[in-house]
Every structure is written in C-alpha cells, then in structure tokens.
Amino acid sequence: MTVALPRTPSPLVRYIYVGRVETMSSKKLTVDAELEKLQQESFNYFLHETNPANGLVIDKTEADWPASIAATGLALASYPVAVERGFMPRAAAVERALTTLRFFWNSPQGPEPDTTGYHGFYYHFLDMQTGRRAWKCELSTVDSAFLLAGALTAGVYFAAHTPDEHEIRMLADALYRRADWQWTQDGGATVTHGWKSESGFLKYRWGGYDEALLLYILGLGSPTHPLPEESYAAWTSTYHWEHCYGQEYLYAGPLFTHQLSHVWIDFRGIQDSYMRDKGIDYFENSRRATYAQQLYAIDNPLKFEGYGRHCWGITASDGPGPDTIKVNGIERQFFNYVGRGVPYGPDDGTIAPWAAAASLPFAPEIVLPALDYCIHQAKLTELNSYGFKASFNPTYPGIFRDAHGWVSPWHYGLNQGPIILMIENYRTGLLWQLMRNCPYIASGLRRAGFAGGWL
C-alpha cells in the first residue's frame, strides 16, 4: 500500500522512506528506536509502580491510590515484551509473574465485603498492600477479563521446563478455569457489569459494541463454566452501525473500545456473523474508527484549541475538570476522568496521546505523525519517568498548564499497557502470536462464530 506523504513529513514518517531521521531535538533515531524508547519508558511504570510482594499494580501515580486489576493484567501481558526487548531479565519477569499469579490464586474469594473476589472474578480496585477490596468498589467482569487475559499471556509465554515457569502455566490455567462466567449472567442473556457484596449484581449489562468483545471471547472459551453461545448473539444484537466523517463502522465513541480487545486477539481476516454481513473484520473496523477520530479533530466542530491532523485521541482519560468556565467568550464544561468519545461526545478538548499510540497497528500512516507531534512538539514525554502523561487540554486555562495547555499530573496503568503492547503488535505481532497459541482463545472465537484467516 502506498501512503501519500504530507508536504512536510514528520520525522517519524520520513524515516519510513529515507532510512534515518533527524528529529526536532537533533537526535538521529530510527522509527523503531523511537518506538522502543516509548515502550521502555511506558514499561517503567510497571517496573516501579508494582508491589513486589504481591504483583499488584497501582491504578495511577497519585499517592495512596489502590491497585487496578486491569492494570495488573496489562503488566502480566507486558512482561513477555519486556523480556524480548531487554527491559527486564527473564528471571525477574518470571518472579514478578509468579508472585502475581500466586497472590490471586491464594487471595480470599467469597461473598464477604472485604475479600479480593468471588466466583473467580475480582474487585476492580484492591488495596496495594493487603490485596483486599478498596473503596467498596464493584467486582468488575470486564476488568477481571483483562486480568485473566494477562494471566493467560504469561502462561503461554513462560514455556520453559523449569519449576517456576511450570507453576506460572499451572496457575494461569487454574485462575482461568475458576472463573464462573455463567454466574455473571445473573439469569439474563448477556453478562452484567459486575457485582457488590452489599447489593448483588449491578443493573447494567454489557450492550453495544465495546471492550467486552474480549470478555465474551474469554467467557465462551472456558472449559469449566462457559457462557452459552446465545450470549454472544444477544450482545451483538445491541450493536449500532454508524456513518460519520466518511467512515462506515461499528460504532463506539471512546477510542479505547476499539483497541483493548485487539491487544490480545489478532482479528485480521477473521469474522463473526455480524462482520461477515458487513464485509469487513474488527481490525478494519478499528482502522475506520481511528480515521474517524482524526477527521473529527480536523473538523473540530466545537472549536477547541490544538485539535488537528496530528493532534487527536479522544477516549476515556483524565481531564482538567470538573469545571465550567468561560474561555474566549464561550462557556465550556470540563470533565475529570470520563469516557470521552467521537463524534457524539462527551468532548471537552482533552486529548489522550496513549489513545493514538494504541491505534498504531491499525493506521500507522496517521498514528506515527500524531506520536511525533506529542513527543517533539507538545513535548509530552519530557521530564516524565513513564513516557506520556495521561492527557492534555490546550483549551483549559487553569493550573498545571504549559505552552500546550493543561497537562494531567498523573500516569495510569491502564494507559501504559496498551502503549507497550500495541506498539509491540505493530512491530512484531508478539501478543497476537502468543494468543493464537492459547486454545481457550481459539475455542472462544469459534463458539462466537468466528471463522477464516488464521483461525
């Protein structure tokens, strides 16, 4: 495929054609080296923001914050990348993975309010030290899916005939088999969002296209407590096909919903019944959603500062709010952490650079210039130990501003993981290759009606 170059190609894009680049900081780096630097900086979060005693990863870098089970699952999936890239010795990665899996296998499960989980699923947030439920939060089905996907990744990758790596494989398998997916349906056709010990199942169910694609594949693939095949059909019956900004695609507003399942599953060339009817696959769908994001930023219907061809990425992220103020005569509402989306909002001018990075496999021709902008013009990795900060907002006039506006003071584990893993899928397809070798993924895909391609 021939990609039309912009008149003044960014340093990252220019390398694709001429072999080496000179960036704005006058450092000569290949695209590969620049991407690897971003991967390593992002991985440093998991290296330094994990409790080595239990493997739990802090949700964000704010003091006294709890662990996120989704971030912990992304860390488990990132350890193979770290070994392959030389970010971490294999022995250290084995120790981290084994510590994490032992913790979850041995942690208390039950209906009591201060456990770690129930029915093989886990509370969304856990105390970093004790591993018990934090904030009276919900037991989260989708965040448990990210945790279990990470465990399965470790189980496939650590395949050496050593006692520790054998135990990793056994624990990953046991944790996955323990999850009672049928329980999460609460008698309904689809899966609930979660459960609380005080009040039972949450009233919300997974409906409409979103990151639950991974959840359903894992649930369908279970050899012990599988979801019925009808549950997947019930979920896809809630899909909404949309036409916006010249793109026809299966709609979901926040960009992360088009990315997170693709961290683990290579959807290129495989289709379920819904996608067969549309004549595309989920990978192509994510490419179109990525282009819709860029085109929305170019159009910039709400006239926010900074939006443009190389400045986009609207997703669930930190923000400068909650606040409502007048900016240049226009009353603007700003949010804190919320699931921002395109084109129907919410949108308050907040850009998340990790969202662009996680679309790299789908549309490198527009993602690489966006990364170049974030690194070399907005300088969102400068003076940061962990690569990109969570988000920035050029429109917001409050504190924590620099030349490019408000910048989040935090890093989030849920942002760091997709940067590492989707860059790696773009570079080598490592996660996709690993999970092709996971029989539960293949079984779940087939039971969902997927066929074709590598499957």
Give the ranges of each region predicted by the language model.
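Short, solvent-exposed loop/turn segments at the edges of extracellular beta-sandwich modules
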Residues: 1-8
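Extracellular and select intracellular beta-sandwich modules with Ser/Thr-enriched
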Residues: 8-14
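Short beta-strand edge segments in extracellular beta-sheet folds
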Residues: 15-21
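Ser/Thr/Asn(+Pro)-rich, low-complexity disordered segments
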Residues: 22-455
